[in-house]
Each structure stands twice: as C-alpha cells, then as structure tokens.
Swiss-Prot record:
It catalyses: uroporphyrinogen III + 4 H(+) = coproporphyrinogen III + 4 CO2. HAMAP family: URO_D. The gene is hemE. It is an enzyme of class 4 (lyase). InterPro entries: UROD/MetE-like_sf, Uroporphyrinogen_deCO2ase_HemE, Uroporphyrinogen_deCOase. Pathway: Porphyrin-containing compound metabolism; protoporphyrin-IX biosynthesis; coproporphyrinogen-III from 5-aminolevulinate: step 4/4. The record marks 76 as: Transition state stabilizer. GO terms for cellular component: cytosol. This is Uroporphyrinogen decarboxylase. The keyword Cytoplasm applies. Catalyzes the decarboxylation of four acetate groups of uroporphyrinogen-III to yield coproporphyrinogen-III. NCBIfam families: hemE. Belongs to the uroporphyrinogen decarboxylase family. It comes from the Bacteria.
Length: 343
C-alpha cells in the first residue's frame, strides 16, 4: 500500500491539505435508509458485523453516497468481549448487553481462540480493500481497553460508568489484568486488520472523559500506549488515530504519552486548545453531531469555525462523536459540500 494519493494518510503523515479530507464516525449507520434495509436483512446486529458480504455493503454505502475520503470498517468495539465469550447481544432500544464479569471471571479469561473468532471481520477488511477505489483510505479500529472494560464490568452501558470505576478502586490488580489482556488482544486485532488491508486504524476511548487525572493516566493512557507500542513493534509504519472522548485538558500530553500519530477531538474541546494540540501533529474532529441534525446556519457556522481555526494545519475533518440516527442525509451532503468547497 503506497497510500501516496490517499488524503487521510497524507494528513496522518503530517501534511496540511486544503480542503481537508473528511469522513464521519458512524458514517455507516441508521441515518441512512439503505443501512436500515441491510440491517433488517442481516437479522441481528452481530450477524451484520460477522457477515462479510453485508458488512462490506454497509461500509461502502456512505462512500457511494458522499464520496468520503475514508471508509471505516463496519463492526463494533464489543466484538472483542464477544470473542471472549461474554454473551454479547444488542437489544432493540436498550443498547448492548453482556454477562457482567467479576474477579473470578477475569482470572479465567484467555486469549485462546479470540483472533480466530474474529476471522469474519478480517475477511471484511480484505474484501473492502479490493472493492474501494485506490484513493480511499481504509480505516480499521478497536475499542480502547478502558471503554471495553466498562461494558464488561457492568454488563451494559451506564451514564457515568460508575460500576467500572468502583471495581477499579476495589480490585485494582484484577482490573489492570483485564486492561492488559484487552490491550494485548486489541494489538493483535489491529495488526491483523492492517495485514488484511487497513491503511490506518483508530482506537476509540468513548468513556475516557469519566476518569480523574490519575485514573486517566493509568486506565486510558497506559493501555492505549501498550496497544500502540505492540502494533508498532510489528508494523513500524502503522498509522494510528487515538480518540479519547471527553478528556479535555488531559489531551495536552496524550499524543506523546500514547505514541498516536493523530488525536481525535470531541466537540467540547475549545478550538484554541485544538490549535495548540495541532502544533504537535494532526488532529481529527470536532463538529458537534447535533449541528448535523440542525442543519442550515448552525451547521454552516460550526463547519466554518473549525476550518477557520484548524484548516491551515494537518486536519482530518470529522464529528466530535458518531453521527446520530436522526441526522438528515441531506444535511450530511451539505456538510461534505461545504468542507470540500473551502479554498
């Protein structure tokens, strides 16, 4: 993969492009009618993730519709606990559920068979690289150990992930064992995605923002550093984006501490601070997804502010989190058009 003509890769290598490349987190999702039709055909959400033909289709849908500069593998961060036999399921209107894990359960966890369980995901990556135009960057991904662990401890998502925080305070050794195991599995998972054709990968730490300063270093920074070091020890040229949602001022040293090439920013990050972070390397973000729902002047103003402040440096234009199901596909088209119209 030379990747010299793939705009997202160019930015990850430190180049500044005008207009910047654009893709959106959850760009393949429920806001698109074609996605909803494919989702029904799949049966369950996990069946959609594990059926390469359908996962390829939903990955390509937003590329066909909008011509984004990157396609991100359609899967979910919770396929890793699913591969660890945690009985993961997605219940309509309730979000993900799985069997909660305790100290004894953590002691019994094993990496055996995990990568084999994820073979359909790797098949999807291989097929995607064959289907995508040469100029489109293919992104793989995984969940950060802290975020994945929050679901494993509680058995579901919670508003502030208090169950995982409490478990970490009460059982720090068991919790750190869980994070280390997840980091090692995630590194293997990303290496395999890269080997199958992913040009770059992103690590999603969606719940990093609930951690205090000390815990952030221990549970968000260290496991992600471990993943990146492991991937780079085997694939030195790997390009990696790390997204720690809600981390705020703790992002100041996040890139250096983890070794990430680029850092993703949520919409709460002040653009003045984002500009400081951009001096050290590429940034990705950070439009409020609700502006896409709103459309019109609110959408245009949000886009223009980001481009005015960050558009002269290495920027991958994205949202500050995933696009929401109530977004109008026409508003997404307007977003892409406005970003690409910047000169």
């Amino acid at each position: 993969m030379s990747g010299t003509h793939r705009k997202v890769l160019e930015v990850l290598n430190g180049r500044s492009l005008t207009p910047p490349p654009i893709w959106l987190m959850r760009q393949a999702g429920r806001y698109l009618p074609e996605y909803r039709a494919t989702r029904i055909k799949a049966g369950s959400f996990l069946d959609l993730c594990y059926t390469p033909e359908l996962a390829v289709e939903v990955t390509l849908q937003p590329i066909r519709r909008y011509g984004f500069d990157a396609a991100i593998l359609f899967s979910d961060i919770l396929v890793v606990p699913d591969a660890l036999n945690r009985n993961v399921r997605f219940e309509e209107g309730q979000g993900p559920r799985m069997d909660p894990i305790d100290e004894d359960g953590i002691a019994q966890l094993s990496q055996t068979g995990v990568i084999e369980h994820l073979a359909p995901v790797f098949e999807t990556v291989s097929r995607l690289r064959g289907e995508l135009a040469a100029e489109i960057t293919l992104l793989g991904f995984c969940g950060a150990p802290w975020t994945v662990a929050t679901y494993m401890i509680a058995g579901r998502g919670t508003p502030d992930q208090a169950p995982a925080r409490l478990f970490a305070y009460r059982h720090p050794k068991a919790f750190e064992r869980l994070l280390a195991l997840l980091a090692d599995i995630s590194a293997d998972y990303l290496v395999e995605q890269i080997d199958r054709g992913a040009d770059a990968v992103q690590i999603f730490d969606s719940w990093a923002g609930v951690l205090g300063e000390e815990e952030f270093q221990r549970y968000a920074v260290e496991p992600v550093r471990r993943i990146i070091a492991s991937v780079r020890s085997r694939r030195p040229s790997a390009k990696i984006i790390a997204f720690a949602k809600g981390a705020g001022i703790l992002l100041k040293n996040y890139r250096q501490a983890t070794g990430a090439d680029a850092i993703g920013l949520d919409w709460s990050v002040p653009l003045s601070f984002a500009a400081e972070l951009q001096k050290d390397g590429p940034v990705q973000g950070n439009l409020d997804p609700v502006r896409v729902v709103a459309g019109g002047a609110a959408l245009e103003h949000g886009i223009d502010r980001i481009l005015d402040v960050l558009g002269q440096g290495p920027l991958i234009f994205n949202l500050g989190h995933g696009i929401t199901p109530d977004a109008d596909p026409e508003h997404v088209a307007a977003l892409v058009s406005r970003v690409r119209g910047r000169r």
